[in-house]
From Swiss-Prot:
Location(s), subcellular: Cytoplasm
Cofactor requirement: [4Fe-4S] cluster
Pfam families found in the cross-reference section: Diphthamide_syn
Organism, scientific name: Gibberella zeae (strain ATCC MYA-4620 / CBS 123657 / FGSC 9075 / NRRL 31084 / PH-1) (Wheat head blight fungus)
Compositionally skewed regions (Acidic residues) per UniProt: 404-424
Gene Ontology terms: cellular component: 2-(3-amino-3-carboxypropyl)histidine synthase complex; cytoplasm
Subunit structure: Component of the 2-(3-amino-3-carboxypropyl)histidine synthase complex composed of DPH1, DPH2, DPH3 and a NADH-dependent reductase, predominantly CBR1.
Protein name: 2-(3-amino-3-carboxypropyl)histidine synthase subunit 2
């Protein structure tokens, strides 16, 4: 018998292990004064544009760090709009704050706006200024303060030679300071300093910027200039500026400090070129739709499909929402990805965890070139702005016909008994030197039904014979791709030969079947097993 307890059992942690609940993070509050709020968020201009457009349902899109000001912005904007509407006896307008716009926040979130049937979107903060596909947009960049004295001293410290040629640009949130900085530089003797202004042209020499100059110059003229960017630019802009100017300097904010990111950017560009070489040997390419709001994204997808098909590669179009390595790793048959998005979000910055390389449409064009043609002169573009969507259809058809003619010549049988695919020149991975046999899967032969060109046989009732009804089930020869409806499908081939689990029931294929036998019967005090008696 167990001994009796002399005291109550300890059912709690010791006194010195007091449960400590971490204090909740304090909820941030808006620190702007009423006047500063109206100025920063341009309440008056926004209200005027809304009234001029006649929009009744307005969606406000904030970046995450500005959401703390959202309630006050809604209140101030409603008050400004309703003051004039009441005087004119107009119905009240409704304002909505769009939620879940963190991913690709530089683009106007038309999907979130459609959830509230918004007529217009007011986009706050920095933006890529990509044209929208459906809804009109009002852009409010907001503004930040800049210490002019420290800024000029940093530039003078870096550029002691006052004859240097400088282009001054800034992030949209600091754009209002550019003209003042250039004016102060010219007072210091930097007469070759020029400013920039905002323009909605992602395909410009500086995306969405125009260089202000008394004379008209081509892009080659500006390659002799050094460019200074006020505030930290995104990686896509960093790469673009690095490849188009003599030198690149970044004035970090809010404490102005001039940095030279040349070494870091050069390393990033080399890594981009390595990914291009990886895609050059890929046979199956995934077209990753990263936006549904940018204009021309559908035509861009069609253009990419055509160019991938011309290279005898297979493409699959996939939409997964917010990107992460786990989502893309589910598509094991995809050997590389190309992102369809704006010029900023088209570049996946933190891509170390991705199983397959992810590149931009411009990089894909370089990857699809033949080894004889592939020359990268250092130019770089981030989005779909350089896809050549306005190419004439006849040019594309001629190019396609040329590719077919080239393919026919390439596949001619050669002496020595080598036929068909075996007569094609070998392709190698430029990184590893290994022979690649699957870089152009759409060239591989597909089993075709020989009876399709023969006359139809019929039985006495005039119906097709069973042989013709089942002629689609034909065993593939070695080296042939699986096909769906007569079209080669690397995805189906991977499902057949590459995936270890292909769906419910497929894991029973290798199990040997057994006869049904009589099992144990009876109750707990005695069982009977077949004819062996009671146990």
């Amino acid at each position: 018998m167990a001994s009796e307890l002399s005291s109550a059992p300890v059912l709690s942690t010791p006194d010195d292990h007091i449960l400590e609940v971490p204090a909740a993070d304090s909820i941030p509050t808006s620190t702007l004064s009423d006047d500063a709020l109206r100025t920063t968020y341009e309440i008056v201009r926004t209200a005027d544009e809304i009234r001029a457009g006649g929009w009744k349902r307005i969606g406000l899109q904030f970046p995450d760090f500005m959401l703390v000001d959202a309630p006050r912005v809604v209140e101030a904007l409603s008050k400004e709009i309703n003051t004039h509407d009441q005087e004119e006896a107009k119905p009240e307008r409704r304002i909505y704050v769009l939620a879940d716009s963190s991913y690709s926040a530089c683009c106007v979130d038309e999907i979130a706006a459609e959830h509230v049937s918004a007529d217009v979107v007011v986009h706050y903060g920095r933006t890529c200024l990509s044209p929208t596909s459906h809804l009109p947009a009002i852009y409010v960049y907001t503004t930040h303060d800049l210490d002019y004295e420290v800024t000029i001293n940093e530039i003078k410290k870096e550029f002691s030679d006052k004859t240097v040629k400088l282009v001054i640009m800034a992030d949209l949130t600091y754009q209002n300071h550019v003209d003042k900085v250039v004016s102060l530089l010219k007072e210091q003797g930097y007469n070759d300093a020029v400013s920039t202004e905002v323009t909605r042209d992602p395909a410009a020499l500086i995306p969405n910027r125009k260089i202000l100059s008394d004379e008209t110059h081509d892009d080659e003229h500006w390659k002799a200039y050094s460019i200074i960017h006020i505030s930290d630019p995104p990686s896509a802009l960093l790469l673009a500026l690095y490849t188009r100017f003599a030198s690149l300097h970044v004035l970090s904010t809010p404490s102005p400090a001039l940095e030279n990111p040349t070494m870091r950017t050069a390393g990033l560009l080399r890594r981009r070129f390595a990914k291009v070489l990886a895609l050059a040997s890929a046979g199956v390419i995934g077209i990753l739709v990263n936006t549904l709001s940018v204009a021309n994204y559908l035509s861009s997808i069609n253009t990419l499909r055509e160019r991938i098909a011309r290279a005898d590669k297979k493409s699959y179009t996939i939409v997964v929402g917010k990107l992460n390595p786990a989502k893309l790793a589910n598509f094991a048959e995809i050997e590389g990805w190309v992102v369809v998005g704006c010029w900023e979000s088209g570049l996946i910055e933190d891509d170390a965890g991705y199983w397959r390389p992810v590149i931009t449409p411009f990089e894909l064009e370089v990857a699809l070139m033949s080894e004889e043609e592939r020359v990268w002169g250092g130019e770089w573009w981030g989005g779909i702005e350089k896809l050549g969507l306005n190419d004439k259809p006849e040019d594309a058809s001629k190019e396609s016909e040329g590719a077919v003619a080239e393919e026919e010549v390439e596949f001619e049988d050669v002496a020595g008994g080598v036929e068909g695919e075996e007569s094609a020149p070998p392709e190698f991975d430029m990184r590893t030197g290994k022979l690649i046999s699957s870089s152009r899967p759409m060239r591989l032969p597909v089993r075709k039904n020989p009876s399709t060109t023969a006359e139809t046989e019929a039985n006495s009732d005039g119906q097709p014979t069973s042989t013709q009804q089942n002629d689609s089930l034909i065993k593939r020869s070695v080296g042939e791709l699986a096909s769906i409806n007569g079209v080669a499908s690397p995805g189906a081939e991977f499902l057949r030969s590459g995936r270890t689990w292909q769906g419910l029931g497929t894991d029973f294929d290798n199990e040997a079947s057994t006869l049904v036998e009589e099992g144990r019967s009876g109750v707990a005090r005695g069982y009977e097993v077949g004819e062996s008696g009671r146990h």
